[in-house]
Amino acid sequence: AAQRQPERNKIIPRYMTPAAAGYASPALGDDYEDYEVAADSEADFAVRIAGDSMEPYIHDDSIVLVKRGATIFDGDVGLFFVDGDMKCKQYCQDYLGNVYLFSLNRARRDADVTIPASSGITICCFGKVLLKGKIPLPQD
């Protein structure tokens, strides 16, 4: 019987411009390099994180894997483009339609973003950050 070949890894783009974990950063562009991930990974692209507002779950200068077009639910971490800034944050929407983008590092709650439903501000989600397990929403 023929031996089954192990699946090869797949190549995704890793964008060179970091996504901010608390600070402004340009949107994803054409500046990327090939990045190898497991063949069964759901990731569509990778990006380096700059800043400490997502500690201890996502460290400064680490690379996160992102699934483009994934539905974002309360508690999920995503890459968001808000008012010209790219941010890696935890998502939450309340029953009134207000959106909250939380820093996981509560010492950096100053980097949280609140978008009132009535503001007219457009928020664009580039994708869901693929993490191991669910992260609880902040209680403060």
Where are these regions (language model features)?
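Short, positionally conserved secondary-structure boundary motifs
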Residues: 1-60, 93, 119-124, 130-140
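Feature for secretory/organellar precursors and membrane-associated catalytic proteins
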Residues: 24, 37-116
